[in-house]
Amino acid sequence: MKKYKIGMYGGKFMPFHKGHNYCIETAIKECEKVCVILFYGGDDELRIIKNNKSKYLSVESRIKHLKNIIKKYDNAELYIVDVTKLKKEDGSEDWDAETPLVRKIVGNKLDVVYSSEPSYDPYFKRAYPEAVHRIVDYKREKYPISGEKIRNVKNEKEREKWIM
């Protein structure tokens, strides 16, 4: 029997990299069911794509990479959520507006939310009070990388060593 019944891991995955994969694999080992959610269409995403033409940043590329990972596991499902119209007045992402969309996917019995960011804790406590926030490799010791670091790497070969 696994530690948790239902877990969720969401993100933009820009690009999908080894750290993301490690978090998904951790969730898959610990949960009976894992909902992996790709959010796309936020202003920050559009700004990133405008300034960075990497083939790994397109929505299609991210969906393809996630599908290739998820299909290996019986207890994981991929969901795609368009957040284009869910913005605050200043144009920034509105995670609180996204919460009802996530609830449609995971229901009200979410046991655990996965991330590698302790700073997400206040939002997760507010949005999913019944769930544990499981922080995976927050010091990035196993995979010392982030999407932002990868996007800033100029050398394509260096970038590709982190991408799944």
Describe each PLM feature range.
Residues M1-M164:
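Nucleotidyltransferase catalytic core that binds NTPs
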